Regions:
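Single conserved hydrophobic/aromatic residue that forms the stacking wall/gate
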Residues: 323-332
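Generic structural marker for isolated residues within well-ordered, non-membrane alpha-helices
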Residues: 6, 33, 113
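Duplex nucleic acid-engaging cores and interfaces of nucleic-acid transaction enzymes
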Residues: 51-54, 61, 65-310, 315, ...
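N-terminal cofactor/phosphate-binding cores enriched in small/glycine residues
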Residues: 18-20, 24-39, 43-44
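Short hydrophobic beta-strand that contains or immediately precedes a catalytic carboxylate
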Residues: 318-319
Length: 332
């Protein structure tokens, strides 16, 4: 496992495996990044602080994914649903988003509408609708009218809830919506009604709409701050109509009454389950990227301040205590 980590980090950063191993060894021994960069160049092969930090970050992320995979495998194993093929796929996946998509159908859920419908015995009806061969689904649904299922429409609604959850957990469907968000996601912000005066400093964002991928980090962070303060309502949305059409092309294979039931379930799935889930994903990712970019800008600005002459034209002598008992003096 550790050697696999070394290979992946090496491929991602373009740094040799030997340098990765040596650097991680120093970090595991408790050495700090500045110390390694300054005093252990002969061990790391001359890596600078940025490269060492990247190695550390990649290693920590891989460790987190490995722990998550262990939890996922144990959970699915306890359900008795872990096949050899599924286990192999999980073990070979190192993309966190894909890993969570694979796990989603097996993830323990609170009592959803679909789960309530299953408990009413409506899953066979949902399967029948998905096949889209039955010309009279209402007649078949009548067989399920008993107990908590009050009428035919109640049975069909429960079956649609099951189909909607199935659509929302389908990897291809999720990637389709995810790609739409990535290509055409629009960030929209509107001031909360009645908070106009309190939100004066955010007036530039009272009614704004722009492409998420083109939104600058400082604007995105300002909008998210205002949202956290309860002053703006913020949303991210792709072309809803196009997304639904793509999903219908994937799941709806007939114009008969069963196909119409599936189409209705697909529309519900997108609006109620898929879109909110992917929107949350993109909100988190875009905020993280904006934070990283802001940190880089602040770090560079601070670097310029620290490099500025503190005393103008006056002479300055600096003393650097070396790792050995020696010291180096510089007169500027």
């Amino acid at each position: 496992m550790i050697q696999h980590f070394h290979r992946m980090i090496s491929a991602a950063l373009g740094i040799s495996e030997k340098q990765i191993v040596q650097t991680l060894g120093l970090l595991n021994d408790g050495a700090t990044i500045p110390f390694i960069s300054r005093y252990r160049k002969e061990v790391t092969g001359g890596l600078d602080e940025v490269q060492i930090e990247s190695i550390k970050t990649h290693y920590e992320k891989l460790n987190e994914i490995a722990k998550r995979k262990e939890t996922i495998l144990n959970t699915i194993q306890e359900q008795g649903k872990l096949t050899t093929e599924l286990q192999k796929r999980i073990e070979e996946t190192w993309d966190n988003t894909l890993l969570e998509d694979i796990y989603l159908p097996y993830k323990p859920k609170r009592k959803t509408r679909a789960e309530a419908a299953r408990q009413k015995g409506l899953e066979p009806l949902a399967t029948l609708l998905m096949l889209q061969r039955e010309p009279h689904p209402e007649e078949r649904a009548a067989n399920y009218v008993k107990g908590d299922v009050k009428n035919v429409e109640d049975a069909l609604k429960g079956a649609r809830d099951i189909i909607a959850e199935h659509v929302s957990e389908d990897e291809r469907a999720r990637n389709s919506v995810r790609n739409a968000f990535a290509r055409q996601g629009t960030l929209t912000a509107k001031v909360v009604k009645g908070k106009e005066e309190e939100a004066t400093k955010y007036r530039d964002y009272f009614d704004c709409s722009e492409s998420l991928k083109r939104c600058s980090s400082h604007r995105l962070l300002a909008i998210r701050r205002a949202e956290a303060e309860g002053l703006l309502k913020v949303s991210i949305s792709p072309d809803d109509e196009e997304c639904v059409e793509r999903l219908e092309r994937q799941f709806v294979r007939s114009n008969n009454p069963c196909g119409q039931q599936v189409a209705e379930a697909v529309q519900d799935s997108y609006k109620r389950l898929l879109k909110p889930s992917i929107e949350t994903e993109f909100a988190t990712q875009s905020k993280e990227r904006a934070d990283e970019e802001a940190i880089k800008v602040f770090a560079e600005n601070l670097r310029q301040l620290l490099l500025a002459s503190p005393l103008g034209q006056k002479r300055v002598m600096g003393i650097c205590l070396l790792y050995t008992s020696d010291a180096a003096d510089d007169l500027i």
